């Protein structure tokens, strides 16, 4: 089930807080999809994510895969798996690993690219 943006913001803020307090790694993949296709593509993305990962709607045409306990190479591998799962679909992905920055800065570093 695709979670909404309010849940996404709450979970992202929690991951940042846990990172600050406990030094826990996490990453995210920002996924831009064709407008109106998020619900259709979400189950496919969900099948390639780990059980601990969460897929949320961020904007009308954007999803986030929140990846707890994930380093930079792990985030890049997750992005590759997500892209391969929808081979041929017009999606753009950007991955970023949390390095002590704010959620805003992390999202900016994960700006999707073709």
Regions found by a protein language model. Give the residues of each.
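Short regulatory alpha-helical coupling segments
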Residues: 2-24, 34, 39-47, 110
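Alpha-helical scaffold within the catalytic cores of cyclic-nucleotide enzymes
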Residues: 12, 41-49, 75-90, 111
